[in-house]
Amino acid sequence: MDTPRVLLWAIFLISFLWDLPGFQQASISSSSSSSTELDSTKDVGNRKEGKMQRTPQESAEGRTPPEHGLRQKDLRRRPPGQHQGQEPPGRGLRVVPHEYMLSIYKTYSIAEKLGINASFFQSSKSANTITSFVDRGLDDLSHTPLRRQKYLFDVSTLSDKEELVGAELRLYRQAPPTPWGLPARPLHLQLFPCLSPLLLDARTLDPQGPTQAGWEVFDVWQGLRPQPWKQLCLELRAAWGELDAGDTGARARGPQQPPPLDLRSLGFGRRVRPPQERALLVVFTRSQRKNLFTEMHEQLGSAEAAGAEGSWPAPSGSPDAGSWLPSPGRRRRRTAFASRHGKRHGKKSRLRCSRKPLHVNFKELGWDDWIIAPLEYEAYHCEGVCDFPLRSHLEPTNHAIIQTLMNSMDPGSTPPSCCVPTKLTPISILYIDAGNNVVYKQYEDMVVESCGCR
């Protein structure tokens, strides 16, 4: 058979078989199996070379924009309990100082400048720290008369190293919407620890008296005596008193049923209250003299553990200390502050020992995150030489006089005495602690009043 005829028969056979459905499916399956075998061969080769094929989902993740990857990384670095977008303690507008705490700060700050409150803080029974805690209790949404109301405070930030001097609960009584009217019997308000029969304090209200709004203050010092301090729950109760035995007019009218008691109608309801009218627990403590920087490091370390990121000092032993480095902006502020106030050499250093200006700006130090007031103050510093003969106003010690004399005879053998503060005074600071509580504290030795040679 010649070649043209063979080719013609082959074309005819192929066209005939192509019209059969089974031949098309067999061809597709054969192609798929070939592709699978090819892919398998490639996978084996990739595994040998340390490469793996990525699924479509993995490929999509690999194409994630850099910003998304950065957010995921930051989320992994965020401490437990801090959600994305949550502000660290002491930042933003979440903590609003209560007017009572602001008034305390203003009063004592003015008194410090006038020098009239020294005896208050030097007394053995007085406080140098005042901490405020805002009520965290929930509203009672029931429609029944509210005869008892609980107030809950988180006092875990109080240190057992501090001496408890006093504590008070401040409740703002709103003006009742309507007068009570008869009967003319007293109304008793009593404060107890929750689940305890211990009466902490009591007040008597006159329902027929003036219905002016104002603060009711209860002494709760006994309720805070048990330690350790974690949570403090206080319960306010109301009860009608007995008629006065001398009120003959009321008795002549006969027995009258008093209206049902409801703390809401008395002005003690929680609903529709601005922040400045919420219940406030004020604790007065006396702490031992403590180094400011040590105490602030503890405060910042606690705040960092509660959720601050990227701007607070790393806690000791932190496994990821690198992620808690100060922000570049804060480093620039500190560098600028150091360069502006760190030059103490040259001609001025040859002046005699005296007090020089030193303006402290807490914002430049990066402390404005948690310090409310003051944001700046004049600390002063001592600078100059202590050469022979020493002036009497420098109040030198006998040792400083001898040391200065030896230095004048042989400067190489004995260094000169140093120009240091001889009298320091305190300042008041209002700040936010690690629990987002507003704290007033008087810090000793913050302002140089006089300098001398020592």
Swiss-Prot record:
A single Gene Ontology CC term: extracellular space
Subcellular location per the Swiss-Prot or TrEMBL entry: Secreted
Compositionally biased tracts (Basic residues): 329-350
Major subcellular site: secreted
Organism: Mus musculus
Outcome of gene disruption: Mice lacking GDF6 display photoreceptor degeneration. Animals exhibit abnormal electroretinograms with up to 66% decreases in the bipolar cell-driven b-wave and 54% decreases in the photoreceptor-mediated a-wave amplitudes, as well as 3 to 27% reduced photopic flicker fusion. The lengths, but not the widths, of dermal flat bones in the skull and the digits are significantly shorter than in wild type. GDF6-knockout mice also shows cochlear aplasia, while the vestibular anatomy is normal.
MF annotations from Gene Ontology: cytokine activity; growth factor activity; identical protein binding; receptor ligand activity
Keyword Secreted applies: yes
Induction line: Strongly up-regulated in tibialis anterior muscles after denervation.
Sequence ranges of Low complexity compositional bias: 81-92, 303-319
Keyword Transferase: no
Disulfide bridges in this chain: C353-C419, C382-C451, C386-C453
Name of this protein: Growth/differentiation factor 6
Glycan-modified residues: N117
Known partners and oligomeric status: Homodimer; disulfide-linked.
